[in-house]
């Protein structure tokens, strides 16, 4: 199964991408862009945005987010998708 996460989920819990067991996680590109806009804020939302971006960037170093990057042992993969590739 795949779960599509939105901006609110990621900002509420920066570790949300690791919370769905062996299921795959999809983050639409526009959600990643929205999170990126908040990173300069000095608020909790800004702190959460920076944390989300750090986690995704660390995963990106392991492979292509378009092809899916494993999130860890007994976890699914993370995909960042353009809206037309959401399936």
Which ranges hold each PLM region?
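Active-site-proximal, substrate-binding regions of enzyme catalytic domains
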Residues: 1-87
């Amino acid at each position: 199964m795949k779960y599509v996460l939105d901006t609110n989920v990621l900002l509420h819990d920066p570790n949300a991408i690791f919370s769905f067991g062996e299921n795959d996680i999809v983050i639409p590109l526009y959600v990643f862009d929205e999170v990126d806009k908040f990173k300069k804020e000095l608020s909790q939302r800004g702190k959460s945005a920076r944390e989300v971006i750090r986690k995704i960037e660390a995963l990106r170093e392991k492979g292509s987010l378009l092809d899916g990057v494993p999130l860890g042992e007994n976890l699914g993969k993370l995909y960042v998708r353009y809206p037309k590739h959401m399936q």
